[in-house]
Amino acid sequence: MLTVKLFGSGNACFYDRPIDGFPFHQAYLVLCYLLLNRNHKQNRERLASVFWGNYSTNVSRKYLRNALWKLRSVFQSVGAQLEDYLLVNDDSIAFQTSGPYQLDVETFEALLATTRNLQGEELNQDQAQQMKKAIDLYDGDLLEGVDEEWCLYERERLSLLHLNSLLKLMVYHRSHHMYTLGLEYGERILAFDNTRENVHREMMQLYWLLGEPQLALVQYHHCEQILRDQVGVEPNDDTKYLYQQMLHHRFPMPKEIFVSSRPVEDPRNVNLATATEYAIHEIHHLRQVIEETKAELEKVEALLEQAKNKSV
């Protein structure tokens, strides 16, 4: 089986035999291009122009023939036949998906296909697990170190798909009371793109739900500085409003902010980590309620004392 990894720096092997130098050779990049466009035949002349567009048609086609010869030679050296994977004729070239192969990009997209139109709070447990498997495959941007124009578009598309999937998992964990895990996914998103203001807002709310209002405010200031330094803008009105609500204690307390229409899970189906996290959240909430109740009682006592003094 041919196994190709295009995320990160990339590598390829035929069974246990690595293909040395992959993908940093023009012939290997042609193979990468065919893999990324595996569902379509590629016109030979157009394919040649993608890689050798600065040359005449005759010269670019010659370079393409040389690349195919190089691929055939490399495949033979690891015990594979190029004809099992590439359909080559005078007019076109195509990757044969009928051959035995495994491609990380293809698996990644297939795992995410069923949840593409779902929001994070709409995911069930199996769908969330599928999404986690897909994200585990993404250990770096597509073909890092390759700056060809054809690669940049695919890199951006797959990066957005990856980041949006992380955001869905962040929301999924919030909606299932797993706030710490939600924060971990938020940190992973910001590691790729720390200017995502919606993620900073989500993290502010997750800290609040954990009973850590000071960390929620710190997250806002972190967001504010990043946007100012890297983009030259201030946080938008939604983020500022959320900050002001939290700063002046007008934001709903954890018990009020989370409302779920889902039925309560059977305790037998809740793992220990989830149950522990929920219990910690409840403790934080009860402590806050006690503090607020004490403050209210002190106000009432002060009013009663004032009324008593006036009546004397």
Model-derived features: where do they sit?
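DNA-binding patch around the recognition helix
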Residues: 1-5, 66-98, 225-237
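Short boundary/linker motifs that mark transitions into or out of structured domains
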Residues: 1-30, 84-92, 104, 140, ...
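Short amphipathic alpha-helical recognition elements used for nucleic-acid or partner binding
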Residues: 20-51, 71, 198-200
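DNA-recognition element of transcription regulators
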Residues: 23-32, 57-79
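Conserved amphipathic alpha-helical interaction elements at protein-protein interfaces in regulatory
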Residues: 36-37, 53, 77, 229
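Ca2+-coordinating acidic residues in Ca2+-binding motifs
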Residues: 46, 63, 107
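Intrinsically disordered, charged and Pro/Gly-enriched terminal/linker segments
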Residues: 56-57, 92-312
